[in-house]
């Protein structure tokens, strides 16, 4: 047990342990919580009472969360001193107890940590950010049919541009790097000749690794295995058409993982086309199958034609018995889409998607865009998951002007708590909360952010009253 400088442990409770990335959760886990800055003072108490009430209703005295208050953000500075936004106590507590939940955190002032959220993800190697985007009936939305969108965004959390490896324009290190790239590296790269980085540029590095990509996509596929029907579907979202060696590699490594590690569980989109063509026409030739899966096949070079035909032969030889005759329809479909097109498709063809596996930057964009469709960040939960820790969090900001007014929507943190309960395997309590929240919204008993958008106008509930309304629906 670590020694804490200024923290008080709960009187009882056990530690959550991890085995091969999966949590072993006792009936009385100790769970650190960070209240959060700004409106955290309102939304965390509302969340805690909802979670505790659902657990009590579902399991009686058999299960209980023992809450352990830890500090980050402005509240940490008040206790630990100026600029101490992320105390060592908090780091040690989360490391020891494994799972934590938090409200929104401020952006630190001064040098050092740029983002507390990013710092926590990097410290604990929380490599997958999980953002469900689901519509709750009655929630105001700018879209005609928001109920058609039900996706889970798996955003890689530790690599890509968000690693923060960058240099300011005119910084000496930046100038040295540009000089080296322009005069040494670029001239040696056949595909980059006649290009150069302009003077006065800032430089950011976009690292994307095979190991980082595959461990993240593995989490997405493992999640899909728990789903049923058309929801057993993972889409690799990328800009590989432009960034071939980073975003394109992410796509390729995802397919490689699916067919090598999850062969019995997965079918790629292209493989499904090949097998479907055979099922519809058992006499189809290799060449005609190729014409169906590859537009413009007859205009390709002979080498490319031969490559595609070999691909089809390999699919038939390797999986026609195990995946053919329609059996592939019961498996996880793995496909890919260009990032900019997915922004259109989650609006125009939302039913076609389930789990979106993305790199860091794309995932940030897509998850917020999807949240807007189903009602905004006030109802958008999030989790950051690694192999030895998990942190569940509000996805919105601190909204300091509303702090202490008991008016803000606690839905984001409450639903993040639901994700935590599901992570524990406490599905009965999780379902109780989602059903209670759904009923509250359907009955138009909501906080001001939703009430002001409803027609006809309704009288808003306070933050705490909204929590009580959810509990009353248990």
Q: Which residue ranges define each predicted feature?
A:
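Glycine-rich phosphate/nucleotide-binding loop
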Residues: 2-11, 76-78, 328-329, 343-445
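N-terminal phosphate-binding or glycine-rich loops at protein starts, especially the Walker A/P-loop
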Residues: 7-65
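Structural/interface elements that position substrates and couple domains in central-metabolism enzymes
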Residues: 12, 32, 53-54, 58-59, ...
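Glycine-rich phosphate/diphosphate-binding loop of Rossmann-like nucleotide-binding domains
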Residues: 26-27, 32-34, 38-48, 181-337
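Buried hydrophobic positions in well-ordered alpha/beta secondary-structure cores of metabolic enzymes
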Residues: 37-40, 98, 154, 220, ...
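Generic secondary-structure signature for well-ordered alpha-helical cores
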Residues: 52, 56, 60, 96-99, ...
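N-terminal glycine-rich phosphate/adenylate-binding segment common to multiple enzyme folds
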Residues: 75-191, 202-203, 360-365
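Glycine-rich phosphate-binding loop
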Residues: 93-106, 266, 281-388
